[in-house]
Amino acid sequence: MTGHDGRPMVLYDNIFPATPSGKIELKSVALAERWGAAAVLPAWRSRQTPYPLMLVSPASDKRISSTLGDLAGSRQAPPLLMNPADATQRSLTHGDQVRVWNDLGEVLLCLAVTDAIRPGVVASEKGAWLMTSPTGQTISALVSADLKADLAEGACFNDTPVEVGRATP
């Protein structure tokens, strides 16, 4: 696509970050000087945890966080997505009621076994209402309030170690 001057249209081709280098700085001294150490990406750190799976909690296409949770499409708990290799290792099958837990709590969800998720990772949408849960907790209960994702101190919905097993009746 070209503009009125015949040149290719490139979004933001003349806008540059307000950093000393004029480039995106993933580890910025200028941000650290202005906002403190929280502005600098942390160095890699080992995560020693007894929970082998990493829970990611993406946004739902049925809600805006928890807003609109009372609509018909949101009145049930979202499934837990798991890779077939992880399901087989735990003797779990598609449709099983599973328990997802860590030191912060536990949630019961219906398992959806799918190749759409990587081994070692499980996923369930954030924002479900408490009324959808038999334990009175949703996936957000497993997310640490102590870990901060960014300068705005957002929650780490994609950095939550958990384990999954068959729910006992």
Predicted regions and their residues:
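Long, low-complexity segments enriched in small/aliphatic residues
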Residues: 1-70
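Long, contiguous, secondary-structure-rich segments that constitute the structural scaffold
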Residues: 65-80, 85-169
